[in-house]
Swiss-Prot record:
<feature type="binding site">
    <location>
        <begin position="22"/>
        <end position="24"/>
    </location>
    <ligand>
        <name>substrate</name>
    </ligand>
</feature>
<comment type="similarity">
    <text>Belongs to the phosphoglycerate kinase family.</text>
</comment>
<dbReference type="GO" id="GO:0005829">
    <property type="term" value="C:cytosol"/>
</dbReference>
<feature type="binding site">
    <location>
        <begin position="368"/>
        <end position="371"/>
    </location>
    <ligand>
        <name>ATP</name>
    </ligand>
</feature>
<feature type="binding site">
    <location>
        <position position="223"/>
    </location>
    <ligand>
        <name>ATP</name>
    </ligand>
</feature>
<dbReference type="GO" id="GO:0043531">
    <property type="term" value="F:ADP binding"/>
</dbReference>
<keyword id="KW-0324">Glycolysis</keyword>
<dbReference type="GO" id="GO:0003779">
    <property type="term" value="F:actin binding"/>
</dbReference>
<dbReference type="InterPro" id="IPR036043">
    <property type="entry name" value="Phosphoglycerate_kinase_sf"/>
</dbReference>
<dbReference type="GO" id="GO:0044409">
    <property type="term" value="P:symbiont entry into host"/>
</dbReference>
<dbReference type="InterPro" id="IPR015824">
    <property type="entry name" value="Phosphoglycerate_kinase_N"/>
</dbReference>
<feature type="binding site">
    <location>
        <position position="37"/>
    </location>
    <ligand>
        <name>substrate</name>
    </ligand>
</feature>
<feature type="binding site">
    <location>
        <position position="172"/>
    </location>
    <ligand>
        <name>substrate</name>
    </ligand>
</feature>
<keyword id="KW-0547">Nucleotide-binding</keyword>
<comment type="pathway">
    <text>Carbohydrate degradation; glycolysis; pyruvate from D-glyceraldehyde 3-phosphate: step 2/5.</text>
</comment>
<dbReference type="InterPro" id="IPR015911">
    <property type="entry name" value="Phosphoglycerate_kinase_CS"/>
</dbReference>
<dbReference type="GO" id="GO:0004618">
    <property type="term" value="F:phosphoglycerate kinase activity"/>
</dbReference>
Amino acid sequence: MTNKKELKDVQVKGKKVLVRVDFNVPMKDGQVTDDNRIIAALPTIKYLIAQEAKVILFSHLGKVKTADDLEKRDMAPVAKVLEQKLGQPVKFINAFEGKQLEEAINEMHNKEVILFQNTRFADIINSNGQISVDSEGKAAAKRESKNDSALGKYWASLGDVFVNDAFGTAHRAHASNVGIAENITESCLGFLVEKEVKMLSQCVDNPVKPFVAIIGGAKVSDKIGVIEHLLTKADKILIGGGMAYTFFAAQGHKIGNSLLEVDKVEIAKTFLAKGQGKIILPIDALEAPEFADVPAKVTTGFDIDDGYMGLDIGPKTIELFKKELADAKTVTWNGPMGVFEFKNYSIGTKAVCEAIAELKGAFTLIGGGDSAAAAIQLGYKDKFTHISTGGGASLEYMEGKPLPGIEAVQSK
């Protein structure tokens, strides 16, 4: 997947460059509350300006399910933040198709930047410009999310070159990534996506051994594909979080009132048989009588007491996991070890985060989501080789699945 055309392989001077960015940022009362994704896109945008391109940016913002979302998911506030971060004007076009957008693009000069309206407005507005909803008032047009061929061709017709710099949607085949890439003469990856692909590839496809994967989070069902694929790649897989109790149940241990996916016990048994010696489970836990931030009780072994639930890995497990990590040269971590939101049950996640951060000479990658939030919150952001920006996309890459948004881009 790393043989894709990159931004520096393409001549962009004077060209209209369509850039699919990921500006799907959190909003509150019409204000952007976290601008990290906007900042992450700046290197690609600044490079295109320096190369004297005409820069046409677009992104989705949240899900557009009802007509009310047209107001809530407006990109105008994002344009203002981008303008501040970029230090030059960003012209916002309140349209995602039509004459207003076409005229604005045709009037552009080199080095100018425009951002057009939320691509997912095309999920509720049909090709006649009418709001299209079903009997329940839910979006029915679905032109963006179902990769409508006419919309992909239309957007492609607005530019000369397409740059996909939105890793967060790389696992989706939408009109604004796959649709454009398939209908334009030249396409490439932006700097952000290029880095993500290189880092994930280095971790999963060509790891320096020993390769240790740490998988946590609440559910086995969310990580089945990841565990399956990593069993063929990793030397060890350390399992924590709520999902560990389904594995314990598969081994016949008592799990009290802990989280259990009954329908996944057989899969857990299969993994344990396949991954003999590879899968390392916790050897103790922190348990509580309720799902609350109450003082923890440490179990003496695998079994959870009746009337209790396991909410974090225990001290012996922390030492075991540290020992398993000590010689690792490649580490990927995806999912917390316990209920990280509860102070009493955030100890395991913090300890694992610290243990990875302190490894010398290892390639360390966090697969986005809660683990990334934990590392950033603990101040370890710069101690990891890479923290992925795409939760779902990085998970699917770790499952060994092709990512449509990247596959559609031209090869070198």
